[in-house]
A protein has these predicted regions:
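Residue-level detector of alpha-helical recognition elements and their boundaries
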Residues: 60, 122-123, 127, 225, ...
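Long, contiguous amphipathic alpha-helices that act as assembly "spine/axial" helices in icosahedral shell
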Residues: 45, 71-133, 147, 151, ...
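Short Gly/aromatic-enriched secondary-structure transition segments
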Residues: 58-65
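Sequence/fold signature of self-assembling virion shell proteins
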Residues: 3-29, 36-52, 73-77, 139-146, ...
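Generic structural signal of hydrophobic/aromatic residues within well-ordered alpha-helices
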Residues: 11-15, 19, 23, 116, ...
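Extended, solvent-exposed, turn-rich assembly/linker loops in the middle of proteins
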Residues: 130-202
Length: 308
């Protein structure tokens, strides 16, 4: 009997890699290097406070400044998992890896990835919509070919005026990207967008890549299902009761600090699993997203619905 721990390690590596590559928000995981993470469900986010320039004195020299480096401990609030059974009569040891890989790959693609994307986008929208005087949000906009480019450019301008000169990324639903394409009649520039080691050709506006996202992931709030309560057995997520539809979101690439980690996957062979004559696969994933307080001005969201 092959070592099920080896199977688990293979799946963990492949599923983690697949998660980053297939997420529409996978570029946000590139910012996880900003935090300290040693496993488990806690991370430490650094913040730096610096004093500004002072006068240089020719006799006394430099005015002494201070640097304060602090770490804020955050807990990953998203602890999600599922257990699957593959009947022993459907597979044997020789084709278990191939079958289980297909099952877990499909689960990751169709259920895990959309939920993580929707969660991240909703949290970023919540932050942008929470800025005073709606400085980072626009409401009641119906997508229109004649105005969509100006609306996006205005969002970019707002972020730039807030002092964020780094690369911006535009997350847009497919109605928005279609309107953009029709507005420019094929004249839009395209470029390479790198994420998880994969290079993809995407359209650009003002040097900002546009990532197309399904509408079902573009909500200002979502409700997570626990997978066991009546009516929630299917698991996953749904649009929040008070959620609004997002047309597009603009965010500085370096702003969202996202972490997604799969806990050690557990695989039990039919000889070990006692409840049924089946292979048991236990999948668990920690994830969350954070934005530093001084980076809230680097997010802009355009909402289809009215504010009230």
């Amino acid at each position: 009997m092959a070592n099920t721990l080896e199977y688990a390690k293979i799946f963990e590596t492949n599923l983690d890699k697949l998660a980053i590559q297939t997420l529409k928000t996978g570029f946000m995981d590139g910012n996880s290097g900003q935090v300290k993470y040693n496993g488990g469900n806690e991370i430490k986010i650094p913040s730096i406070a610096l004093q500004g320039l002072g006068e240089y004195d020719r006799e006394k020299g430099y005015t002494q400044g201070s640097v304060v480096l602090k770490y804020q401990t955050k807990t990953m609030t998203q602890d999600r998992g599922r257990s699957f059974l593959i009947d022993a009569m459907d597979v044997d040891e020789t084709n278990f890896v191939a079958t289980a890989s297909n099952v877990m790959g499909e689960f990751q693609r169709t259920r895990v990835t959309p939920e993580i994307d929707a969660y991240r986008i909703s949290k970023l929208a919540e932050i942008a919509m929470g800025v005073e005087e709606d400085a980072q949000a626009e409401y009641s906009y119906t997508i229109d070919n004649s105005t969509i480019i100006n609306r996006i450019k205005n969002g970019i301008k707002i972020i730039r005026e807030n002092g964020f000169d780094s690369e911006l990324v535009i997350l847009a639903n497919y109605d928005t990207t279609t309107a953009i394409e029709e507005a420019v009649l094929g004249k839009i520039t395209s470029g390479t967008f790198s994420q998880g080691g994969i290079n993809t050709k995407v359209p650009f506006i003002d040097d900002c890549p546009i990532i197309s996202v399904p509408k079902a992931r573009m909500y200002s709030a979502i409700t997570l299902k626990d997978g066991s309560t009546g009516g929630q057995e299917d698991g996953g997520y749904e649009k929040g009761s008070s959620a609004k539809d997002i047309n597009f979101m603009i965010v500085a690439r370096e702003t969202p600090i996202a972490v997604t980690k799969q806990d050690k996957m557990r695989i039990f062979s039919p000889e070990i699993y006692q409840k049924a004559n089946a292979w048991s696969l236990d999948y668990r994933r920690y994830h969350d997203i954070w934005v530093k307080d001084n980076c809230k001005g680097s997010i802009f969201v355009n909402i289809k619905d009215a504010k009230a």
